[in-house]
A protein has these predicted regions:
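Glycine-rich phosphate/diphosphate-binding loops that line cofactor/substrate pockets in enzymes
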Residues: 1-4, 63-68, 100-107
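N-terminal amphipathic/basic leader segments beginning at the initiator methionine
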Residues: 2-64
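Active-site histidine-anchored catalytic micro-motif
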Residues: 8-15, 29, 80-113
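Proline/serine/threonine/glycine-rich intrinsically disordered regulatory regions
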Residues: 20-21, 74, 113
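Short beta-strand elements in bilobed, periplasmic/extracellular small-molecule ligand-binding domains
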Residues: 66-78
Length: 113
């Protein structure tokens, strides 16, 4: 049997412009901020929090002949707003990087944006 392809799932979704107030952590937590197994659990729900890109990719991969293992990292999304708060972005980026390093080795990374 072939080895399963290890694919990280992650995303950061924000439509922003400089005229709107800064998008802080609460802006993301109020719409979608999931990490690790929370992502896989949400995919299984009929109307989860995740942006459509994540469950759509997951379901497409499940319907291929490619054996794969999804490795959920972090997915966050906000309503349209201003630029992301710099301190929150750095903390989130560092968390994503740490989780990616822990998930190594990887065959691919799916990033929803």
């Amino acid at each position: 049997m072939a080895e399963l392809k290890r694919v990280a799932l992650m995303g950061l979704l924000l439509e922003s412009n400089s005229f709107a107030p800064v998008s802080d952590e609460q802006a993301f937590r109020s719409l979608c901020y999931l990490s690790g197994d929370e992502i896989l659990n949400d995919i299984a729900l009929p109307n989860g929090e995740l942006p459509a890109e994540i469950p759509s990719f997951y379901n497409a991969m499940e319907n291929t002949s490619i054996g794969w293992k999804p490795l959920p990292i972090v997915v966050l999304a906000s309503e349209p707003g201003g630029p992301i708060d710099q301190v929150f972005f750095k903390r989130t980026k560092d968390d994503m990087e740490s989780r990616l390093r822990t998930a190594m080795p990887l065959d691919g990374v799916y990033i929803a944006e």
